[in-house]
Amino acid sequence: MRLSHVILGEILYYDPEFEKEVDKIVDLGGKHLGSGDYGSAYLLNGRVYKVTTDEIELEHAEILKGKKTNNFARIYEVEVINPKLGIIQMEVLGEFRGEIPDEWVENVNREAEQHGIDPDELDIRPSNIMVNQKK
């Protein structure tokens, strides 16, 4: 068993449910893409599977699931295991490099509001921005 930590606020703890979900994806051949404050992302069958403990992210993913948007990753499926653990299946995007244009942030905030998402709940920072490599 691998030991990993999930960071929630300032508390580090081992979450066996999180590890169980990660292990399922890895056992199916998922390739680790990266980890952040609240989860880890894996590439499997041409999609990104993100295991997250961020309940707000899960709520946003549920709202965006199946919708075509201009500024958010396409969400195919959302599996909520419990309010603080879930798996989001989304499109594969490329890494963003550079500065975040103010106009883009304004567009994201506007689109979030159109979908009923509070823009103040968005975590806009370079490490959370991905780009569509096909465009």
Language-model features: where?
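Active-site beta-strand termini and strand-to-loop segments that position acidic
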Residues: 43-46, 92, 132
